[in-house]
């Protein structure tokens, strides 16, 4: 039986995540890329900028009304924080049936939107047409903390290091290779957006300290957890293994994972479980690609889930 193709448009397609989204859409047998919006690349052929796409489609500079008028089955918003609202409002008014997936932080605290971290929130999906994609750091933190959430004796402390692609394409100190050379940049050391996001989602306070490093892509998240009672390494390892046994994108490893081994891959590695003397403090490390599981891959999981398809279609 042939499944009818769905049309999809991407807004903010020039960025690193937009490029990864185009690759995933090109690999998806049931999706047709109907438009891509980029102010900077308007008029240029998509195929000239993305080897994965074969076709004549050109980038367009579309405002919110023009995006809504396209009436695509799916629209993915890959815009900087604070820019999604006009597009959402226009689609709500003109094409409310459109599935909207927003990759910014704009709707992550809105209870009317489904918060799409499938490995943790899949069971709460109930047909919502508005999906908020989690943050990249926030994804790594939640997947690391969740298996021990009921054992916490205090706020988890999360030390995150990201490649500079996480700072986007707009020039800044945090994506300037010259300034990052032989350097690590701490920033937003309290009250980071992802700190608030994880605290809200897990229902416990979380302390997060982000840093940018000279590599291009990939996140290392080192999480320090204080426990209510002593646990052995085997007990902790079993919690992770059991929690994610049926999750093909999450791999539990023995040693602390390296970010160089996850770059360009769709999944998450969690490991390096290390106990302090007394067995009431444990450190766990997670790695993921911030552009993939931290953004584009997760958006595709959410899209597939919402449309009733295999969640890993185009990802496997």
Swiss-Prot record:
Enzymatic class: oxidoreductase
GO cellular component terms given for this protein: cytoplasm
Transmembrane segments: none
Pathway info: Amino-acid biosynthesis; L-arginine biosynthesis; N(2)-acetyl-L-ornithine from L-glutamate: step 3/4
Enzyme Commission number(s) of this protein: 1.2.1.38
Domain of life (superkingdom): Bacteria
Pfam families, alphabetized: Semialdhyde_dh, Semialdhyde_dhC_1
GO biological process terms, semicolon-separated: L-arginine biosynthetic process
Keywords for this protein: Amino-acid biosynthesis, Arginine biosynthesis, Cytoplasm, NADP, Oxidoreductase
PROSITE patterns: ARGC
UniProt-annotated catalytic positions: 136
Subcellular location: Cytoplasm
Catalytic reaction(s) noted: N-acetyl-L-glutamate 5-semialdehyde + phosphate + NADP(+) = N-acetyl-L-glutamyl 5-phosphate + NADPH + H(+)
Molecular-function GO terms, alphabetical: N-acetyl-gamma-glutamyl-phosphate reductase activity; NAD binding; NADP+ binding
Gene3D superfamilies, per database record: Dihydrodipicolinate Reductase, domain 2 (3.30.360.10), NAD(P)-binding Rossmann-like Domain (3.40.50.720)
Function comment: Catalyzes the NADPH-dependent reduction of N-acetyl-5-glutamyl phosphate to yield N-acetyl-L-glutamate 5-semialdehyde.
UniProt record similarity statement: Belongs to the NAGSA dehydrogenase family. Type 1 subfamily.
Protein name per Swiss-Prot or TrEMBL: N-acetyl-gamma-glutamyl-phosphate reductase
Species: Xanthomonas euvesicatoria pv. vesicatoria (strain 85-10) (Xanthomonas campestris pv. vesicatoria)
Gene that encodes the chain: argC
């Amino acid at each position: 039986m042939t499944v009818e193709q769905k049309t999809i448009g991407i807004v903010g397609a020039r960025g690193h995540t937009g490029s990864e989204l185009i690759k995933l859409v090109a690999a998806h047998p049931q999706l047709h890329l109907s438009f891509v919006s980029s102010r900077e690349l308007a008029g240029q052929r998509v195929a000239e900028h993305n080897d994965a796409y074969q076709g004549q489609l050109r980038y367009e500079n579309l405002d919110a009304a023009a995006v809504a008028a396209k009436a695509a089955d799916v629209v993915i918003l890959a815009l900087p924080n604070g820019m999604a609202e006009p597009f959402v409002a226009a689609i709500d008014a003109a094409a409310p049936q459109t599935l909207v997936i927003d990759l910014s932080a704009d709707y992550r605290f809105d209870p009317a939107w489904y918060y799409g971290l499938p490995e943790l929130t899949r069971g709460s999906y109930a047909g919502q047409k508005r999906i908020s994609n989690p943050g990249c750091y926030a994804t790594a933190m939640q997947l690391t903390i969740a298996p021990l959430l009921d054992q916490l004796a205090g706020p988890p402390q999360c030390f995150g290091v990201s490649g500079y692609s996480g700072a986007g394409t707009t020039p800044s100190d945090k994506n300037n290779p010259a300034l990052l050379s032989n350097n690590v940049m701490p920033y937003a050391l309290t009250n980071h957006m992802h700190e608030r996001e994880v605290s809200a989602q897990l229902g416990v306070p979380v302390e997060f300290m982000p840093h940018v490093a000279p590599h291009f892509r990939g996140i290392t998240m080192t999480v320090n957890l204080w426990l209510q009672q002593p646990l052995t390494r085997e007990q902790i390892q079993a919690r992770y293994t059991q929690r994610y046994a049926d999750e093909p994108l999450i791999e539990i490893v023995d040693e602390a994972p390296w970010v160089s081994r996850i770059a360009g891959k769709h999944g998450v590695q969690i490991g390096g479980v290390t106990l302090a003397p007394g067995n009431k403090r444990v450190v766990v490390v997670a790695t993921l690609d911030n552009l993939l599981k931290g953004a584009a891959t997760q958006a595709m999981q959410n899209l597939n889930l919402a449309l009733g398809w295999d969640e890993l279609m185009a990802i496997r």
